[in-house]
């Protein structure tokens, strides 16, 4: 039974990677596509915001700045659709949403930045990069989102340490995928020049059960 579950999770990880490759590599190699640039205005245009992660919560695209600044951004799907598939050429102004977290810069030694964000219902999961002069680590934080205001709250105690597979400066777990009741964490790089045996981490919702799955 356990082996069947492991195989199923592996298949889902491979499927996610396959979908990513399908969308990042066009099958029509001879046709050149022109990117459609969208106009974005407001605070998010400031390069210091450094958007590091994003995920959909219902019909809202939530964008996570890497800095500890107390807010995230949200763009409605309808706003994106009207500009990508319609004739709307006006500027999108992402809405600032409260992001309530502890002061990790004081609470967590080596706190560097927020990296990834993912939603499972009203639950929200984030990775926090921990950076020292000669080592790296990562924390998985768990919180919740208000379905009406979109305000995100992360309690101080909901942290799980997830060790990096190897030391590469400024590299940590920067992608999260939800798989039913588990969170799949992917390291920033998985090439064999840096990691001999790359793997994904499957973490349960409470953060007390972590399983490695080879990639």
Task: Pin down the residues of each PLM region.
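Sequence/structural signature of beta-propeller domains
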Residues: 27-215
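Sec-dependent N-terminal signal peptides
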Residues: 14-23
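Short, basic, low-complexity termini and linkers enriched in Ser/Thr/Gly/Pro
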Residues: 1-10
């Amino acid at each position: 039974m356990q082996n069947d579950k492991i195989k199923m999770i592996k298949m889902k990880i491979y499927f996610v990677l396959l979908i990513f490759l399908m969308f990042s590599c066009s099958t029509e190699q001879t046709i050149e596509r022109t990117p459609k640039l969208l106009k974005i205005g407001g605070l998010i245009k400031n390069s210091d915001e450094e958007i590091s992660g994003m995920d959909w919560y219902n019909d809202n695209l939530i964008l996570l700045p890497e800095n500890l600044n107390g807010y995230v951004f949200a763009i409605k799907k309808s706003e994106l659709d009207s500009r990508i598939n319609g004739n709307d050429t006006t500027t999108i102004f992402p809405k600032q949403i409260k992001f309530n977290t502890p002061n990790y810069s004081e609470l967590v030694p080596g706190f560097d930045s927020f990296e990834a964000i993912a939603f499972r219902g009203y639950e929200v999961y984030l990775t926090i990069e921990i950076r020292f002069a000669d080592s790296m680590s990562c924390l998985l934080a768990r919180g919740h989102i208000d379905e009406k205001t979109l305000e995100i709250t992360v309690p101080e105690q909901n942290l799980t340490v997830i060790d990096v597979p190897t030391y590469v400066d400024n590299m940590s777990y920067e992608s999260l995928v939800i798989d039913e009741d588990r969170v799949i964490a992917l390291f920033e790089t998985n090439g064999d020049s840096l990691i001999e045996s790359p793997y994904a981490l499957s973490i349960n919702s409470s953060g007390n059960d972590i399983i490695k799955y080879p990639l």
